[in-house]
Amino acid sequence: MSDAYCTDCKKETELVVDHSAGDTLCSECGLVLESHSIDETSEWRTFANESSNSDPNRVGGPTNPLLADSALTTVIAKPNGSSGDFLSSSLGRWQNRNSNSDRGLIQAFKTIATMSERLGLVATIKDRANELYKRLEDQKSSRGRNQDALYAACLYIACRQEDKPRTIKEICVIANGATKKEIGRAKDYIVKTLGLEPGQSVDLGTIHAGDFMRRFCSNLAMSNHAVKAAQEAVQKSEEFDIRRSPISIAAVVIYIITQLSDDKKTLKDISHATGVAEGTIRNSYKDLYPHLSKIAPSWYAKEEDLKNLSSP
């Protein structure tokens, strides 16, 4: 319940909303402060015969500000028994033509929602991806291109903007057949296209190795103790000029931390969990090896433990 000023009570009082009547009442004196309000959220109850093919909902779904026809609408149909009434059929064609502009967006949003669900992404990322695609559509820049690659690229960019990055390889798994190269090209195209709009540039943000750490560790079922050590180690690794991608650094830090524990993970396991090739992990290990004593947390591994690690 929220508060509002009641003209009868002459003070701020709690409000009671009667959804069935559409009235907002003062909780103390019962004065109707607002009447006949429309609830635009989805209908929860149905009243039609369940065996009927008609839609049992009296009100449509929640409004979507990205759609032109998202407000409450009226359906224009032919009169009962009419086979070709000129007026009603003309109005019907006009209505269908008016709603066509949203059909492509609705399909795009459905596909993005499905991809987002398969990746386990939060709603804010899905909504941001929808916004990116809507901006492309407004500029008529999505036509003639691989739509699945565009949807996937919008999700990739949205993840980065929301500081929940995913690798292109992870995105590729749910991209309905779009390849890494196609998604990469689509991503570059979106950044270039939307960046041309004044004040509307696409800021991808900066990816850090730590952004992937918890998810990769979870994929490997690492202990909380090891996860904490890996997160601390990857933060310390940023102090050195290690010219490797954040994903590669995350993978090699996990390899180092697990080799210092009783629950060792093979390069194959880490490669499968992170999507980084075994050869890349080996080469990254060579770059981090000289800094092991400064990267590995002292509470997790002693100097003697570090000396027992294999040399590259």
UniProtKB/Swiss-Prot annotation:
One of its GO terms (molecular function) is zinc ion binding. InterPro entries: Cyclin-like_dom, Cyclin-like_sf, TFIIB, TFIIB_CS, TFIIB_cyclin, Znf_TFIIB. One of its GO terms (biological process) is transcription preinitiation complex assembly. Sequence repeats lie at residues 115-192, 216-290. Keywords: Metal-binding, Nucleus, Repeat, Transcription, Transcription regulation, Zinc, Zinc-finger. It is found in: Nucleus. Zn(2+) binds at residues 6, 9, 26, 29. Transmembrane segments: none annotated. It comes from the Eukaryota. Disruption phenotype: Embryonic lethality and aborted seed when homozygous. PROSITE patterns: TFIIB, ZF_TFIIB. A zinc finger (TFIIB-type) spans 2-34. GO terms for cellular component: nucleus. Pfam families: TFIIB, Zn_Ribbon_TF. General factor that plays a major role in the activation of eukaryotic genes transcribed by RNA polymerase II. Interacts with TBP2 and is required for activated transcription and possibly basal transcription. Plays important roles in pollen tube growth, guidance, and reception as well as endosperm development. Is partially functionally different from TFIIB2 and PBRP2. Belongs to the TFIIB family. Associates with TFIID-IIA (DA complex) to form TFIID-IIA-IIB (DAB-complex) which is then recognized by polymerase II. Interacts with TBP2. Interacts with ATHB-7 and ATHB-12. PANTHER family: TRANSCRIPTION INITIATION FACTOR IIB-1 (PTHR11618:SF82), TRANSCRIPTION INITIATION FACTOR IIB-RELATED (PTHR11618). This is Transcription initiation factor IIB-1.
